[in-house]
Amino acid sequence: MSGRLILVRHGQSHGNVERRLDTRPPGAELTDLGVEQARDFARSRRNPPGLLLHSVARRAAQTATEIGTEFTIAPSEVDGIHEVQAGDLENRSDDDAIAEFNAVYQRWCEGELSIAMPGGESGSDVLSRYLPVLTDLRLRYLDDDDWTQDILLVSHGAAIRLASATLAGVESSFFLDHHLANTEAVVLVPITDGRWSCVQWGSRTPPFYPEPDVHPVEDALQAADPMG
């Protein structure tokens, strides 16, 4: 049986607490709670991963370090899996910025991937750097019949959701409405013909039904953490 690809959001960062659009690496560090979240995540796993990777962002590296310490595994940094780049909205925490970020993200979820964050990335930009990393991991490891361990990749909420839904065909209203809390994960399993199946999304398992009434901008404005 092939291993799985586990995409876990980093632990709580100071940027999350401050409700900042903190997307440009290296970015904010983990809070004390974020460190504990990373340790708890590792302790909740039954088996150690065969490979532990993280993005270039400081909060992802720190999360991976804590996980690696629990498993006595050295993490490695990977380019291309950092957060959606907010551009002109970077480091802002005002309602206008949060609303604009989530409005653009909603358009991506609805198929308008060419739309860009002001001064930042489009959905196509994000996928063009993120998906090749996952494809490479599949070809090098998961498609090998002798590889049976999971690959754990510490990344970022908005990027994880977009990439995972694209690969596994998760319905757009579902992934738009279901953010990932700190150290929650999406679990992908390789299936036939190069396709992927999503077997876990945060605390949820399939089927991932469409959400009839989603309000991502309003929800983000009310959320303690508008990212994820």
Model-derived regions: residue spans:
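Acidic, low-complexity terminal tails and accessory targeting/binding regions
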Residues: 1-3, 84-96, 143-149, 165-228
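Active-site-proximal alpha-helix that buttresses catalytic centers in soluble enzyme cores
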Residues: 3, 8-73
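Active-site metal-binding loops of divalent metal-dependent hydrolases
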Residues: 11, 157-158
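Phosphate-handling substructures
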Residues: 29, 69-131, 200-202, 209-216, ...
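Generic structural signal for well-ordered alpha-helical scaffold segments
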Residues: 39-43, 127, 131-142
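Short glycine-rich phosphate-binding loop at a beta-alpha junction
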Residues: 49-56, 145-154
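Glycine-rich phosphate-binding loops at beta-strand->alpha-helix junctions
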Residues: 59, 159-160
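Active-site signature of alpha/beta-hydrolase-fold catalytic machinery across serine-
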Residues: 66, 162-166
